[in-house]
């Protein structure tokens, strides 16, 4: 994908807005066209206004703009978090099986999420911390810090400190 315009376009279409309707009192219809094609970038203020019009926080999508399907990845990530919070290991395992069939989760940094969540299930669901430590340490060694969310790194350290 690679730019926020694609996400704006998909949200606009999902809401049934024309470019003209989306742009009203924000910018020109042509400017929306250029944003959606990746030829222009919206300012932070414009992104806020577009978010309000679309009823979605577009800022949340920046971490997913390089995904083939940012909506699917964002949804799975939210579901992973809910399962971890609720210690729902069966649902988490099911989600991981589904995620392994999504192309984005086969490449970094998203593949780390699948690996980490599998370890999380072993550590907290099966009480197998000891045999999971080497794999957790390996993940930390492999992480490219500029591509992985700091919260992810904190989660790995939290499991290691259990």
Predicted stretch roles:
Residues 15-34:
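Short alpha-helical DNA-recognition segment
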Residues 1-14:
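A short, Lys/Arg-rich alpha-helix, primarily the initiator
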Residues 83-98, 124-141:
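Helix-turn-helix repeat elements of alpha-solenoid scaffolds
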Residues 63-88:
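Short, charged recognition helix plus adjacent turn
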Residues 10, 20-21, 49:
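Alpha-helical residues within helix-turn-helix
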Residues 74, 78, 110-121, 152, ...:
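"A position-specific structural signal for the A-helix of alpha-solenoid helical repeats
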Residues 45-60:
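DNA major-groove recognition helix of helix-turn-helix/homeodomain DNA-binding modules
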